[in-house]
Amino acid sequence: MSTAAAPRGDGPPSPARGSRRYRSVPGLAELGDGRISYSERSMPLLAALAARFRAERPFDGLTIAACLHVTAETAVLVRALRAGGASVRLAASNPLSTQDDIAAALTARDGVEVFAKAGVDRDAYYEHIELALGADGAVGPDLVIDDGGDLVSTLHTRAQPAMLGRVRGGCEGTTTGVLRLRRMAADGTLAFPVIAASDTPVTRLVDNRHGTAQSVIDGLLRASGVLLAVKTLVVAGFGACGSGIAESARALGARVVITEVDPVRALDAVLRGFRVLPIAEAAPIGEVFITATGSTAVITAEHLAMLRDGAILANAGHFDVEIDVRALAAMAVTVHTDVRPHADAYELPDGRRLLLLAEGRVVNLVAANGHPPEVMDLAFGIEALSLARLAGSAEQLPPGVHRVPPDIDAEAARLVLTTLGARLDTLTEAQQAYRDSWRLGS
């Protein structure tokens, strides 16, 4: 977090109460502002939405609590929401992913309350989330936007009932978070509607497959420096994220092995030319491992004991539970920290060394800068449009997890296609009549 200066932007200025926990380094805000401006140039959808929101003011008088990775792309989203009149309070969605220069810029340049700092412990992480919700006496949020479900779960377990009752609705941007929220809805806990922004055809294609693939490989290479060509690389999970990672690794020359529990996804992997094995059989032959399941205990002590000397471990899931880091630490006789930036070498009693990247946390945001701006432009554009819909018509949605309205998904795709110079055909009257009729046959 960073100290406040004169606020800039369209939303109401607010004092940065979180600044008392973080003193900005001189010049940090200027550095962050430059990086935000660079990303803005590659995010035309949010630029268009900011202009629309500035005219329509869908968030006038509303407070939005956000729990997101504090990156330059997130800052562009925050500025778009403020253009629509929102007051925004931002906490990080991962203890290690905050880019402090971006936090400083949002606080000093935009007057946003940012409760985030890179490298905080678990207690401080959740304290920041509570501050973003208004735990220090501030008015609670009208809308929420989450990335992993920590903010929404904290709101339900630690907030006052009056604060929970104030929330009109929210958005969740990750598959992991959507799964958590669906479990909350199933047991009757979820008290307001949440739109699953990650669960759309557009997001699965652009964000999960292309964005995650590129940024995870980027983080892996930055942290390890490994040559992927001819390496045996094991990807745990072949969903939208895992399949994209596998394709990208194969394109760089890796020999990719897939582990899966879902027979349909496993069949998909086989038909795309990948070898599919149980993790217990993949462990002894793998040289690089990337977990992308959204589950827990994927690589356990049993598997760690099988790994060859020099094996590299990276996690692409939202939480640090896919690789059993505690078991790895217990097995090691020595831990050589920071042998490379964001890479720790665990030396085992028999002399083997295993390289753990980003402490087992999400490697693309800890060891790299996350998704490219073009990817986050579309993902955040869908969330911004969904929040605007909730701001005006949340009473039409019951508590629970809801899909992104199809018209929002299509609108976001059309706007991005326009910025890319692509043009679509339209159905003729005859084609539309054919689609609408059941009488026309062979």
Task: Give the ranges of each region predicted by the language model.
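A short helix->loop->beta-strand "cap" motif at the edges of active sites that frequently abuts
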Residues: G85-S87, V112, M163, F192, ...
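Glycine/serine-rich phosphate-binding loop and adjoining beta1-alpha1 elements at the start
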Residues: P15-F59, A92-K231
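Adenosine-phosphate binding glycine-rich loop
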Residues: P15-G18, G27-L45, F59-T63, T71, ...
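Rossmann-fold NAD(P) dinucleotide-binding segment
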Residues: A51, R82, D136, G140-P141, ...
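ADP-ribose/adenylate-binding Rossmann-like module
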Residues: A92, L143-G148, Q160-T175, L304-E347, ...
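Glycine-rich phosphate/diphosphate-binding loop of Rossmann-like nucleotide-binding domains
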Residues: L68-V78, G84-G85, D207, G211-T296
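Short internal beta-strands
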Residues: A86-T98, V257-E260
